[in-house]
Amino acid sequence: MKQNKVKKMMQEGKPVVNGWLQIPSSFSAEVMSHQGWDSLTIDMQHGVIDYPNALQMLQSISTTDVTPLARVNWNEPGQIMKILDAGCYGVILSLIHI
């Protein structure tokens, strides 16, 4: 398992530059992962990216040192665990009501 670049940079107090992926394309994920981003977020909430698309995108990102993140549709443990198992190093949750 590769190092979580985002976690390390945050522990060191360094800024993290994150890219955003909303097109369901492993090719676009691969291109973006070679553009100097520290992390890339796969947006599964407001785009048309589903789990099979996200899995292919994660495979493309995994060939680089970019930290893969995902914003999931909702705060549902099964969905969160599934995307983490697929290779995400972090998850962005929205619509959290405490």
Stretch-by-stretch model annotation:
Residues 1-2, 20-24, 49-53, 71-75:
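Short secondary-structure boundary/capping elements
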Residues 1-18:
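N-terminal amphipathic alpha-helix/helix-capping segment at the start of soluble metabolic enzymes
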Residues 17-19, 40-42, 68-70, 91-93:
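Hydrophobic faces of well-ordered beta-strands that scaffold small-molecule active sites
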Residues 96-98:
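Conserved small/polar residues in nucleotide/adenosyl-binding loops
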